[in-house]
A protein has these predicted regions:
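Hydrophobic alpha-helical segments involved in membrane association or supramolecular assembly
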Residues: 70-76, 435, 439, 510, ...
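Short alpha-helix boundary/capping motifs
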Residues: 32, 67-69, 98-99, 412, ...
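N-terminal charged/capping segments associated with class I S-adenosyl-L-methionine
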Residues: 586-589
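Basic- and hydrophobic-enriched, low-structure N-terminal and domain-boundary segments
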Residues: 1-205, 209, 214, 541-542, ...
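P-loop NTPase motor domains
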Residues: 22, 32, 36, 142-147, ...
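Conserved ATP-driven motor cores of ASCE-family P-loop NTPases powering translocation/secretion/packaging/pilus
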Residues: 472-474, 478-575
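Low-complexity, polar-biased intrinsically disordered regions enriched in Pro/Ser/Thr/Gly
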Residues: 177-183, 297-307, 535-552
Length: 663
């Protein structure tokens, strides 16, 4: 090292010597006046000039000086300094070159020779010093800046799936991902949608636009029967309807399109979710009651099993099952159940007790009634009446008492596309009724030998989906694909309870996540696992710089990255099949949507059709009258049921004792 330093010092001395020679030769007359010329030097320089022509131009000695200066700087190891930048080096070097090489004209200025010489020597020296500084700074510059990748992007980028893997069930989304300092094209291949899918993301992250809409379109193209819960009706419904019109060729049997919409009965089919033909056991009535009551009282989800939670559920279940067995289920509708519940409880209990299959079911109520525990009884009944009273609506009664279609949407002989619309302004009312449709559909479609089907629930926490965890766990073998969209896991835990929320999180095979924060981001980061990453550290002291490189396991996609995803950027993982292996299941990419194509398609969309025309022969709109007449008819039918049943019980010697005499 010392030998190298001596060589570099020698080269720098030679460089300075050439500068001195340049000044001596081209400023000779002035130097002679100053008395600093020497005859020996003059002879040596004249000999060089005769043999080499070294001084034929002012540039040659300058070039030799710069060459030796550069060599001396290259071989010099300076103390590294973070504050030295290429910008400073470039500025110093540029100034040095200008001052050092472009100053020959100063010798020709119309000034005294002494002045010309002073200016020339000053600029030459300043230029040389600037170039010397630039060269020295180069040797002290940190060649590898550890702060070039402050967000660790290179370490956390990885190769993703670039193959398009399709089958008759798959959903395939084109992507762009960053890897090895460039953007690459790839694919997210959901080759097994029957293992359920989750789409997470804060509002505006693009989960509906990039994922949910694509699921709807591709599954319709591939002939799926479809059930879609449309929280912001008719956004998803219009997509499903128009895409079906353009892709009917994907179905062996042409499917029918059905709508449930409580806001506008003109654009809604009618369907009875507790149709007697689909209720074979009192357990079905209990499931329906359970779904309704927990949708109306979300706080009960975490209190399942409590006395004042189970009591109203059992009471409503008994009423539903009574309507199922009364006259063959002629009046078995949810509006009839609400109206019957709101009759005098003495009459209701008397009627229900007259049926042996309901007598034991109602024993808690009957015990309280017969022991005159009025406060307890009133509390039990009020727990059922008060929430259900919010659902008393002529429009809701109209939709839920008809039978335009059945809920077995994946019946191979009658496939259906069913969309149900909610309204954020009336969510608390509509969610309970729609939850009933959900629970009935889940039970009817999750069977062997049916058509492949899809259940798409966007904004899942706005509705309580009874049996969802069981559907995810068992639907795969029955070809039922489930897609759930919501904002984050904390929202799901709040509305579904901790236990059910964890089951849903841990049993879903395909996960898409846009921007999410907090615990959800941490959970997802842990799910994606860790990868071996390279770490580089640098130590700088007065004498030298040392660099060490190590590896360690770190998060493939940290929670901080998930918390700051741009709109349209998603992280996630997919599940594969035995015969369709996907080595890299995890993705961190932008889901590519052809915006121009979407705009063109949307521009051609037609509005959802009008289902029922309430116009009479004279052209008058009779919707309100017909809906009100249906409402009044239901109430009258329930009054008549109570009267007929009480009369029957009074006239039956074996049952007349059930009628409690009023004091």
């Amino acid at each position: 090292m010392r030998g190298l330093a001596r060589v570099m010092d020698f080269m720098r001395a030679v460089s300075i010597l050439f500068v001195g020679i340049n000044v001596y030769w081209f400023c000779y007359s002035t130097l002679k006046e100053w008395g600093v010329t020497f005859e020996v030097i003059d002879k040596i320089l004249w000999n060089f000039q005769r043999t080499t022509g070294l001084f034929s131009s002012v540039l040659w000695t300058k070039l030799f000086s710069v060459v030796f200066l550069a060599l001396s700087c290259i071989g010099t190891k300076g103390v590294k300094e973070e504050k030295i930048t290429w910008a400073k080096i470039h500025c110093s070097l540029a100034a040095g070159v200008v001052l050092f090489f472009l100053n020959w004209w100063l010798l020709e200025l119309p000034l005294p020779h002494t002045a010309d010489t002073v200016f020339y020597i000053a600029t030459l020296s300043a230029g040389y010093i600037c170039m010397l500084m630039a060269g020295t700074w180069m040797s002290r510059l940190l060649k590898n800046n550890l702060m070039d990748d402050v967000f660790n992007t290179e370490n956390e980028s990885f190769q993703q799936e670039t193959r398009l893997i399709e089958n008759e069930y798959s959903v395939n989304l084109p992507t762009r991902f960053y890897y090895k300092k460039k953007w690459n094209n790839g694919w997210i291949n959901v080759v097994n949608p029957f293992r359920a899918s989750l789409v997470l993301g804060t509002p505006g992250s693009g989960k509906s636009y990039a994922v949910v809409n694509s699921y709807i379109k591709q599954q319709i193209e591939k002939g799926f029967a479809l059930y879609c819960y449309d929280y912001k009706f008719p956004d998803l419904s219009e997509i499903a309807y128009n895409h079906l019109l353009n892709h009917l060729d994907g179905y062996k049997v042409k499917p029918k399109f059905y709508i449930i919409n409580f806001d506008d009965p003109r654009k809604s089919h009618r369907c009875n979710p507790i149709n007697a033909s689909f209720m074979s056991d009192i357990a079905d009535a209990y499931e329906a009651s359970y779904t309704i009551m927990l949708n109306l009282n979300r706080s009960w989800i975490s209190k399942q099993g409590d006395f004042f939670v189970e009591s109203p559920i059992i009471l409503l279940a008994a009423i539903i099952w009574y309507l199922r067995i009364y006259q063959g289920g002629k009046y078995c509708t949810f509006p009839h159940a609400i109206e019957l519940l709101n009759k005098k409880y003495a009459d209701v209990f008397t009627i229900l007790r007259s049926y042996p299959e309901l007598e034991n079911y109602l024993s808690p109520f009957v015990d309280a009634w017969e022991s005159d525990a009025q406060e307890q009884l009133q509390g039990q009944i009020a727990s059922a009446k008060i929430p259900l009273s919010r659902m008393i609506s002529p429009a809701l009664y109209w939709v839920m008492t008809g039978d335009d279609f059945s809920l077995d949407i994946n019946n191979p002989k009658e496939p259906k596309i069913l969309v149900v619309g909610n309204n954020p302004d009336r969510q608390n009312i509509y969610s309970a009724a729609l939850g009933l449709y959900n629970s009935r559909i889940v039970k009817l479609i999750n069977k062997k030998g049916q058509l492949k089907s899809s259940v798409i629930i966007d904004e899942l926490p706005t509705i309580y989906f009874r049996g969802l965890d069981n559907l995810i766990a068992t639907a795969r073998s029955n070809k039922v694909a489930v897609l759930l969209g919501f904002q984050d896991y904390s929202q799901l835990t709040r509305d579904y309870g901790d236990k059910e929320s964890r089951v849903i999180q841990n049993t879903v095979g395909n996960v898409f996540s846009g921007q999410v924060v907090g615990e959800t981001a941490k959970i997802l980061s842990e799910r994606f696992g860790k990868v071996l990453q390279k770490r580089q550290s640098m130590t700088i002291n007065q004498r030298e710089k040392s660099t060490s490189i190590s590896t360690q396991m770190d998060s493939l996609i940290p929670a901080s990255k998930i918390s700051n995803l741009m709109q349209g950027m998603f992280v996630g993982a997919v599940a594969d099949n035995f015969d369709e292996r996907i080595e890299q299941k995890i993705f961190h990419c932008e889901i590519v949507v052809d915006n121009e194509k979407v705009k063109r398609e949307t521009a051609r969309y037609v509005k959802l059709p009008q289902i029922i025309d309430f116009t009479d022969k004279d052209g008058n709109d009779r919707m309100q009258e017909e809906i009100q007449a249906n409402y009044d008819r239901i109430r009258q039918e329930v009054r008549q049921i109570v009267e007929d049943e009480i009369t029957r019980i009074k006239n039956d010697p074996e049952l007349c004792h059930l009628i409690k005499e009023e004091e």
